[in-house]
Amino acid sequence: MLIPRVLSRGTSSKAQRNHFSDILSAAPEVPAVIYNSPYYGFETRSELFFDLLEDFPNLIGFKEFGGAESLSYAAENITNQSETLLLMVGVDTQVNHGYVNCGAEGAITGIGNVLPDEVLTL
């Protein structure tokens, strides 16, 4: 999971592309998911995601941590553009929305660390 770099390289799309590219190229055999969290001060949009995907086939999905509106955007503009891209829910309270309304295929949650069996049952 690739988180945005916000402290030393800035929040511009170019800075984020360089950051993600450095990581993706360092481990081209490792499947990777971009972690989008607007709370970091940068929101990864579809243009940047698909720009990266052109160069890095190990980019397989998108984890959305921005809430229902951002999750819907990710589904409509990123993961629904290809059958091979995965959408992961990152906000515990949005798991239902992600699965029911957005076609999410997984969730990376905080509560899963506390109640792993119950979360796996979902």
Language-model segments: residues:
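Catalytic alpha/beta core domains of metabolic enzymes, predominantly
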Residues: 22-30, 37-122
